[in-house]
Amino acid sequence: MTETDPRLDISDLLVRYATGIDSRDWPLFRTVFTDDCHLDYGEIGVWNGVDEVTNFMDQTHAMAGHTMHRLTNQAIAVAGDNASARTYVDAVIMFGDNQAGVNALGFYDDEIVRTADGWRIARRRFTHVRVTTFGQP
């Protein structure tokens, strides 16, 4: 059996984040992060630990309608059991009525570690480039 390119596994990890959050599959979402992860989303908030970030995302997305987190331009660098990734994000978060929403553009800077369970995000910084609203609530 051959080992896969770690960049493919990390790309799958990043897609798993989007899939977990958009489907509100919180057990899947939790598999993206280390237990002691640190996430800094600037004005949106800062969270320490997978429980804290999962609870926040669950509560805020419970009020939302449909969401789509599209991740592109994944620049991944691997050094042994550590990696870094910069990923562009184009997120559409519909309000509960699905008639209006927010479009957030920015990028994630991730520090990723290989664990016994596979690659996990240990630290994430979200930098927003533009946030716009659309539609009539």
Language model segments and positions:
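Short beta-strand edge/turn micro-motifs at domain boundaries
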Residues: 84, 105-135
